[in-house]
Swiss-Prot record:
Residues 67-123 are annotated as: Disordered. Pfam families: RNA_pol_Rpb6. It catalyses: RNA(n) + a ribonucleoside 5'-triphosphate = RNA(n+1) + diphosphate. Belongs to the RNA polymerase subunit omega family. It comes from Halorhodospira halophila (strain DSM 244 / SL1) (Ectothiorhodospira halophila (strain DSM 244 / SL1)). The RNAP catalytic core consists of 2 alpha, 1 beta, 1 beta' and 1 omega subunit. When a sigma factor is associated with the core the holoenzyme is formed, which can initiate transcription. Promotes RNA polymerase assembly. Latches the N- and C-terminal regions of the beta' subunit thereby facilitating its interaction with the beta and alpha subunits. One of its GO terms (biological process) is DNA-templated transcription. Keywords: DNA-directed RNA polymerase, Nucleotidyltransferase, Transcription, Transferase. The gene is rpoZ. This is DNA-directed RNA polymerase subunit omega. One of its GO terms (cellular component) is DNA-directed RNA polymerase complex.
Length: 123
């Protein structure tokens, strides 16, 4: 197995910083089960990702892709993020406005209310 060098990879990405970002993103995809584009020779996902970049199979375009990756789809059981959000009700969870009032009432009833200013509420 030939050693992958930064110079080999820089032919296919603009600079070292993009190389790190593209390599990390591709390594995460490989770790999640995406099919590698080069032979997997008992290497770690980061090495395979760099070998794919050096071979020209993966470029910095991986950083700007807006579509969901197949790895994300696999982790959601084949459903898109929108499908999952629609199933569980979508948007952010709204707080219950009565919850803080109920808590204050409960604390007052059992004597655990904070901020009364009197260290001994029995006097």
């Amino acid at each position: 197995m030939a050693r992958v060098t930064v110079e080999d990879c820089l032919d296919n990405v603009d600079n070292r910083f993009e190389l790190v970002l593209a390599g990390a993103k591709r390594a995460r995809q490989l770790a999640k089960g995406i099919e590698p584009l080069v032979d997997w020779e008992n290497d770690k996902p980061t090495v395979v990702a760099l070998r794919e970049i050096a071979a020209g199979h993966v470029t910095s375009e991986i950083l700007t892709s807006t579509e969901e990756s197949a790895a994300d789809s696999l982790s959601l059981g084949g459903f898109s993020t929108a499908d999952v959000e629609a199933e569980v009700g979508g948007g952010p969870v709204q707080p219950d406005p009565g919850a803080s009032q109920e808590r204050a009432f409960d604390e007052a009833a059992d004597g655990t209310a904070q901020g009364s200013g009197d260290p001994d509420p029995t006097t």
